[in-house]
Curated annotation (Swiss-Prot):
Pathway: Carbohydrate degradation; L-rhamnose degradation; glycerone phosphate from L-rhamnose: step 1/3
Designated name of the protein: L-rhamnose isomerase
Cofactor(s) the protein needs: Mn(2+)
Domain of life: Bacteria
Lineage: Bacteria, Pseudomonadati, Pseudomonadota, Gammaproteobacteria, Enterobacterales
Length: 419
């Protein structure tokens, strides 16, 4: 530990103590908040089922930065490199298309054995795993419908895929001792004016009920459902809208997933957290950065990321909110994208933990909105960076931008050798 870091740390402790904040307690609380990193940033959502196939479902990974992971071993190595540069507890979020098998496996036939290597790797790295059925980039999703498909046999295929995915998820939770959150997102929708908006939603409702009909141990598996405003090719109608899934999660008491990019550009999910928490048992967050649409840019330490973190901390939702990331940028170094986005999420959580929330609540309750605004703004200038640097030091990770040197060295030694 450098003298400069020690001095900054001691000063920060004093400054925060003056406003009633115990920074040591803040760091202890930060270690209670794992962030689930998404595997698909590492290979542009290609997966291993058909890595040369097209990405469909109204989503896009833009760019062609060299060094993309081509197989599970490369992806795990890249994840390890990124995780070494991110302090504190982490999880990994997998999609079904990241299975490993010597022979082709139909998506409705995936089994825990196809993810055994991921589980062993997670054990070795002390990680929890989360999961997602992959209802896109497949011949049977090519017409834009999956769980709401009008063809009974195609719809059943996707139902069976989601049911098989739940068993994989439960396997993760049982093996790793921490529940796997399995999120269902489907691309179903229509490009142009839709006459019958009801029938697809009726089919989706029945399909989801069949998907979750098998009782699984909640200590191992948590169901979540995710809405979306629109996707490319589904601009006019999305079957799984916000209202649909809010109603579903409320009536079935599943978790609800709120994705930062899946709403109108003037909406923010930070404002939805407290409302949804009144009705659903748990929330899954997909923290992202939409630029004019659901572009899935790398997460910044911006106002909305901070507001999301503050909502979690202010309302003590540590045990009810699961924090996941969802972005994929193929135009920059993919490992750097993971590191930047995940560190920013953790920085936002730390800043939220360093807020004098109790004092701010008193001012708000008393109607002293002048002091509330003044304190909120003054707090931004307190030396939270010194606390962050100490947190990084204790977790043996770089405190500042020196992590980029490690990424560059890895790029030169490893990524540049890939075809």
């Amino acid at each position: 530990m450098t003298t400069q870091l020690e001095q900054a740390w001691e000063l920060a402790k004093q400054r925060f103590a003056a406003v009633g904040i115990d920074v040591e307690e803040a760091l202890r609380q930060l270690d209670r908040l794992p962030v689930s990193m998404h595997c698909w940033q590492g290979d542009d959502v290609s997966g291993f089922e058909n890595p040369e196939g097209s990405l469909t479902g109204g989503i896009q990974a833009i760019g062609n930065y060299p060094g993309k992971a081509r197989n599970a071993s490369e992806l795990r190595a890249d994840l390890e490199q990124a995780m070494r540069l991110i302090p504190g507890p982490k999880r990994l979020n997998l999609h079904a298309i990241y299975l490993e098998s010597d022979t082709p496996v139909s998506r409705d036939q995936i089994k825990p054995e196809h993810f055994k290597n991921w589980v062993e790797w997670a054990k070795a790295n002390q990680l929890g795993l989360d999961f997602n059925p992959s209802c896109f980039s497949h011949p049977l999703s090519a017409d834009g419908f999956t769980l709401s498909h009008p063809d009974d046999s195609i719809r059943q295929f996707w139902i069976d895929h989601c049911k098989a995915s739940r068993r994989v998820s439960a396997y993760f939770g049982e093996q790793l001792g921490t529940p796997s959150v399995m999120n269902i997102w489907i691309p179903d929708g229509m490009k142009d004016i839709t006459v019958d908006r009801l029938a697809p939603r009726q089919r989706l409702l029945a399909a989801l009920d069949e998907v979750i009909s098998e009782k699984l141990d909640p200590a191992h598996h948590i169901d979540a459902v995710e809405s979306k405003l629109f996707g490319i090719g589904a601009e006019s109608y999305t079957v799984g809208s916000n209202e649909f899934y809010m109603g579903y999660a409320t009536s079935r008491q599943t978790a609800l997933c709120l994705d930062a990019g899946h709403f109108h550009p003037t909406e923010v999910i930070s404002d939805k957290i407290s409302a949804a928490m009144l009705y659903v048992p748990q929330l899954l967050l997909h923290v992202s950065r939409p630029v004019r649409w659901d572009s899935d840019h790398v997460v910044l330490l911006d106002d909305e990321t901070q507001a999301i973190a503050s909502e979690i901390v202010r309302h003590d939702l540590f045990d009810r909110v699961h924090i996941g990331l969802d972005f994929f940028d193929a135009s920059i170094n993919r490992i750097a994208a993971w590191v930047i986005g995940t560190r920013n999420m953790k920085k936002a959580l730390l800043r939220a933990l360093l807020e004098p929330t109790a004092e701010l609540r008193k001012l708000e309750a008393a109607g002293d909105y002048t002091a509330r605004l003044a304190l909120l703004e003054e707090q931004k200038s307190l030396p939270w960076q010194a606390v962050w640097e100490m947190y990084c030091q204790r977790h043996d990770t770089p405190a500042g931008s020196e992590w980029l040197e490690s990424v560059r060295a890895y790029e030169k030694a490893i990524l540049s050798q890939r075809g």
